[in-house]
């Protein structure tokens, strides 16, 4: 695997990516970072956002939920709650999720419900980022 990285993206539902790639980019707890072959070993938390990778000169994009990333010996292991290829995001479903999240957040802030405010904010963030990624990166 000379000058390549082994990228594995795994969720509780199974493996999403298992490929040899040229480079990987995502958003960690301390900000965005990139990984290239020969990168030093490290581990970080992953924030809700995008994960992109270059393979054979072409960029590929995923939505990723919170999780962890380990870089070790030219291997990038990403363990996240969920991951979805951007081209597979159902924008209408994401918009419906956004509307539900906004309503739950409104009710939680007004004290009208027992909904956990942090969960409502996380749902809003997930829906917003999914829509942004799908509409900006994939022509519809």
Curated annotation (Swiss-Prot):
MF terms (GO), sorted A to Z: ATP binding; proton-transporting ATP synthase activity, rotational mechanism
InterPro entries (UniProt xref): ATP_F1_dsu/esu_C_sf, ATP_synth_F1_dsu/esu, ATP_synth_F1_dsu/esu_N, ATP_synth_F1_esu_C, ATPsynth_dsu/esu_N
Compartment annotation: Cell inner membrane
GO CC list: plasma membrane; proton-transporting ATP synthase complex
Gene Ontology biological-process annotations: proton motive force-driven ATP synthesis
Principal subcellular localization: membrane
Domain of life of the native organism: Bacteria
Cited Pfam families: ATP-synt_DE, ATP-synt_DE_N
Membrane topology value: Peripheral membrane protein
Keywords: ATP synthesis, Cell inner membrane, Cell membrane, CF(1), Hydrogen ion transport, Ion transport, Membrane, Transport
Family: Belongs to the ATPase epsilon chain family.
Subunit structure: F-type ATPases have 2 components, CF(1) - the catalytic core - and CF(0) - the membrane proton channel. CF(1) has five subunits: alpha(3), beta(3), gamma(1), delta(1), epsilon(1). CF(0) has three main subunits: a, b and c.
Function: Produces ATP from ADP in the presence of a proton gradient across the membrane.
Protein name: ATP synthase epsilon chain
Species in which this protein is naturally found: Thermodesulfovibrio yellowstonii (strain ATCC 51303 / DSM 11347 / YP87)
